């Protein structure tokens, strides 16, 4: 079973904002694929690369995911080895789920991952974060 990662998308206001960032050349590697560079390399790499995704927490709510294609080594200008999480282009919207702030990324068990939204809902506008949070808090979403 694939193992997922979960990560806060700091400074992002919504799914469309994250998507726009991933189209910016600064968020892409030489191959044109979006990536997220982090200091920590997943020790459970084989499980993550067996179909895992990164679930994005935007303003306190898990709202979307991206499939992880590979992990690339990146050496920063400071000589420190980092991990570039190379992502499949395009975001897959998920059911929203509240998530408290945390640092870095965490493993996410597939049983705890919010389900993808059905095809009928994928192109719908996201609810405002405050409304989504309020609905999630009372268990509506």
PLM-predicted stretches and their roles:
Residues 4, 50, 81-83:
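A generic structural signal for short beta-strands and their flanking turns/coil linkers
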Residues 24-65:
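Short, well-structured hydrophobic secondary-structure segments
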Residues 67-114:
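Aromatic- and Lys/Arg-enriched surface recognition patch
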